[in-house]
Amino acid sequence: MLERGHGHVREARADAGADTRAEASGVAKRPGVTRRSFVVGSAAATAATAVALNLSGCGDDGAKKVTGEPQVITDESKVVDVTEDYKNEDCTLQVSASWDLPLGCVPFHCEGDWAALMQAPESARSVNTLGILSLASGTRTTLVDRPSQGSTFSFYDVRCSAQVFAWVEMSYATGDWVLLAQPLQNGALQGKPKKIDSGNADWEPARFAATGDSVIWQKMPLATGSKRSETSHCNRWRVGDKEPRVLCESVGRFATWPRISDGTLTIAPRVNNDEGVFYGITAYDLSSEKMVDQLVMPQNVSPFEAVYMGDSFAFSVEANYQSGGVLGKMGTFIGREGGPFVFLSREPLACVMGKGSTYLIKAQSSHFVVDTKAETYSVLVAPDKALGYGDYPASEGATNRAVTYATVRGDNGLPAAVRVRAFGL
């Protein structure tokens, strides 16, 4: 055990109506913040965290361990407001490749040269299929043409790495679901699919990710179901395993989707349960399954997304809380325990992606491109003829290739295709 979307709700695959909501306003100018103070503050936080690496929400023996202090930031000098403190520049990112997919396709890029595809049906008489897109060649291949559980089940979600292909099938009539995985080699399935988890209407369909030879997922009770008081689990299955094993337990639901970036898993279990509702955004090295960093959110503040990139968390809050200080505000934050934090005051819609000091943050119809080292930001606009909600990130966390997708109109003004774009970072 670790030391501490159809259904893509937490993926923020929102429709056009949901994305017409107004952006949050900026916050006041933050005095006293310079690049040097930000770097020095981050270094101090790194040293403090290194001393406390044994702090986590789960233990090897499952026992409760002491967590870090909730981060109630009231000193605004510890916050760098992107739109006020950084310089606005023209975006220099260039499209390295672009492909048009059939209308309704949704790509998911976990890592490497492959993106899993939820493919739209070819006609009203056929069902969705699952496929894969080579980001090196643009070749699209159908891998699974019908649900393994029979005609009453439909494809619900899909992910892949270079070595494993995983998907959820669900019966919308009963709420039953299964999580399956199958080895993948050079974009082709190997062997037979293996059912690695399942649930009924009391359990939310697995939130999952793929990395290397592993599938990692969260099994949680529905917040309003009869099992809502049950413990949630984060599990791992590797190609060749007979059974999955539990990595972490949470007394209550995890707050965020499991995200994997450069071999580091980020999850947000409940912590400090005797003191109230607290979420600990926690990063684990998957090679050792040891905690490398943790940030405890203010009481009752639930993170919307979180991923560990470099030596900082990139996380977001989707509502304005009446308490909690700065971290109780709606927006996206980059930082770690003790601060300082880079803050973008915009409604969060998806997981952050990027490389090094460059972060791409989805905001309404475009992406903010934030460079914390250069102290600049720019706007990556959606492709021509994109629908009003613009493009969404298919990638997550640290990546050499940022992948986005958008529904674009044809010459007649109607939605015609899904345009996938890749940007070298």
Where are these regions (language model features)?
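Repeated scaffold domains used in trafficking and secretory/extracellular systems
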Residues: L101-C110, G150-R159, N200-A209, V251-S261, ...
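N-terminal secretory signal peptides
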Residues: M1-V33, A45-L53
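Extracytoplasmic/periplasmic C-terminal soluble domains
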Residues: D202-S261
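A generic tandem-repeat structural signature
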Residues: F153-S226
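Post-signal peptide N-terminal segment of secreted/secretory-pathway proteins
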Residues: P107-A162, A166-Y172
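Short beta-strand elements that form the blades of beta-propeller/WD-repeat-like
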Residues: E111-A120, Q163-M170, D213-L222, G263-D274, ...
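Surface-exposed loop/turn elements that mediate protein-protein interactions on large endomembrane-trafficking
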Residues: P70-L101, R125-D145, V178-I196, S226-E249, ...
